Curated annotation (Swiss-Prot):
EC number of this enzyme: 2.3.1.47
Catalyzed reactions: 6-carboxyhexanoyl-[ACP] + L-alanine + H(+) = (8S)-8-amino-7-oxononanoate + holo-[ACP] + CO2
Cofactor(s) listed: pyridoxal 5'-phosphate
Superkingdom of the source species: Bacteria
Protein name: 8-amino-7-oxononanoate synthase
Positions carrying N6-(pyridoxal phosphate)lysine: 235
Organism the protein comes from: Vibrio parahaemolyticus serotype O3:K6 (strain RIMD 2210633)
CDD domains (UniProt xref): KBL_like (cd06454)
Residue numbers binding pyridoxal 5'-phosphate: 109-110, 178, 206, 232
UniProt record, GO biological process: biotin biosynthetic process
This protein's pathway: Cofactor biosynthesis; biotin biosynthesis
One Pfam short name: Aminotran_1_2
PROSITE patterns: AA_TRANSFER_CLASS_2
Amino acid sequence: MPAFKSRIESALAARKAQGLNRSMNVVFAGNQSILEHEGRRYINFSSNDYLGLANDQALVRAWQQGLSVYGSGSGASPMVTGFSAAHSNLEAALTEWLGFERAILFGSGFSANQALLFTLLEKSDVLIQDRLNHASLMEAGALSTAKMKRFKHNDIKHLETLFTNEGNHLVVTEGVFSMDGDCAPLKDIAEVARLRNAWLAVDDAHGIGVLGEAGGGSCELANVKPEILVVTFGKAFGMSGAAILCDQATGDFLTQFARHHVYSTAMPPAQAYALTHAVSMIQEQSWRREKLVELNEVYQTNLSDLDGFVETDTPIKPFVIGESELALQVANACRQNGIWVTAIRPPTVPKGTSRLRITLTANHSTEQVKTLSIALKQALGAL
């Protein structure tokens, strides 16, 4: 049998037998509150476009204007000729807004997280991560030369037991956890890190733009400034890409040694141009965050009495079903009633905690959230 074929077929068969096979659906307007699939319209509660910017016409025009000025692609890595005024302006906007000296741009949050850990850590270092951190962080930690330890989710007492008297320590947590929608106790984590002379890195992919009075995210809300902040542009910014924010020396270090940065083509300058507009929109259009608060109250009022309901202060609303088959059954029943929700199953979440990952956006109406509630209750009642 040709190389790798047996392994590939075996893995695919096992995934299918476990009922965990995944597939991609071709949808139209997946970045809007109403999407279309195979000729039918659904209310979309699966998008990470929390502030509703992905299809905002002002942002679309900004990208189009960027295209007219800069063309389509950057043409090179940022260390060659791929770094334009648009990239520089985006970095400046981010640092001024979030209060850091440097911002280093990346093509995705996954690459930013991996670049950070692979570049910063050495064999003598200790990496301490929340056990529910994103796969990009866990993979990079496992593959790095540093010793990785994991603390129980949001458990400060357990975190305190993992420090040693040797080596540099880096504590890494998400600001908002993508599958549970809960926030890290950043003030407590930051204090523990400070007392242990450790650095703190926060991946705020799901908090930036959504939390805080000016949309500064989890750190603004907690009044905490970590040594390193990772923000991504694929959620509240309505686009894609990411940035690592840090002090000047760390920024220079990453610019020189982060291979994901040095050896990747820079993001299109038109994208950077539009992202700079998104930064302004996030700060100035507080009504988008206010809308999320309103929708959260409607969601909670209508569903908090049901088993599986999880209370969160973020737009991420996990509804825990338990078994994978039942989660799929509920998701499919909701779709029959015109509601698009996604069942999240192992290995993304632990076995026995399969769930619907429901997300609210500023483009939803209160009536749409009420319609979701009715459909979900009907689906659960049919189990």
